[in-house]
């Protein structure tokens, strides 16, 4: 590997790993996988996950005011960037302005998706930040189960 910065694509830099990724993609395409944590992600999701945003660590939350903005207001980059310059970013690490925009947009869209029965998107608190499996499972248990309910699990040992 002559280019230590790895500026080429995977097929060029490591054809063996590239071939394995293609084989795994084909395997997932041809089979119905009934393990929730291994469900097939759509191509658009895979593209987003492989974008430059994967290089960022955005600890904290975007500006709270974006919770009540419509999509077009959130996507007004010039206005948002001007606000960051004046007021600073509430996150611990700086330089995540576009990540803030993506997260605010995802947060708003999720709230709009679940707005129903007289509850508006502005009344719904949404957190779209990823969790590890254990806290995510506990959140689901707390949301859906009552004290004393039975949970079935697999013994994977």
Question: What is the predicted function of each stretch?
Answer:
Residues 118, 142-145:
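Glycine-rich helix-loop-beta junction characteristic of Rossmann-like nucleotide cofactor-binding loops
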Residues 145-157:
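Conserved PLP-anchoring active-site segment centered on the Schiff-base-forming lysine
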Residues 58-135:
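Conserved N-terminal alpha-helix of the aminotransferase class I/II PLP-enzyme fold
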Residues 3-86:
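N-terminal "arm"/small-domain region of PLP-dependent enzymes with the aminotransferase-like
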Residues 32-33, 46-47, 124-127, 149-152:
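Structural motif
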Residues 18, 46-50, 107-111, 138, ...:
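Predominant activation on well-ordered alpha-helical scaffold segments within soluble catalytic domains
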Residues 32-34, 134-142:
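Short alpha-helical segments and helix-capping/turn motifs at coil-helix boundaries
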